[in-house]
């Protein structure tokens, strides 16, 4: 008798294929984040603030659109989430101009993020956002995985923000 909990070989291969695509997307998004942070950090603060305002308007518009109806809207949603996180990270890098400020800002974020993914963080706001699938998709960069229906959340706006903050601060400090 076959145990229902055991995965078939086909399902295991399908999961390995999905992990490949997720890893590929994460690497591409990380490299894109580094490149955009480097390029945008050379702009003036005023132009960064104007770009952030445009991205916020774009994000509000795309968040109100259904995901499955328009592929262009989906990509605009992903781009606005990515640029929004990067622009906020660069602005925070200007504000956190020293290593001490940066470290004192990042340590609580890392602790809260770690706690929210453990059983101790059931009541944290971050965990509640993650469990609400609609809000989580709106605050994530979602990509299709071949062989799977729907969209898969690759990374969140907060992750893009923190990564851009680290890269932007590194460019600014050193």
Predicted segments with their positions:
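A membrane-topology feature that recognizes alpha-helical transmembrane segments
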Residues: 1-174
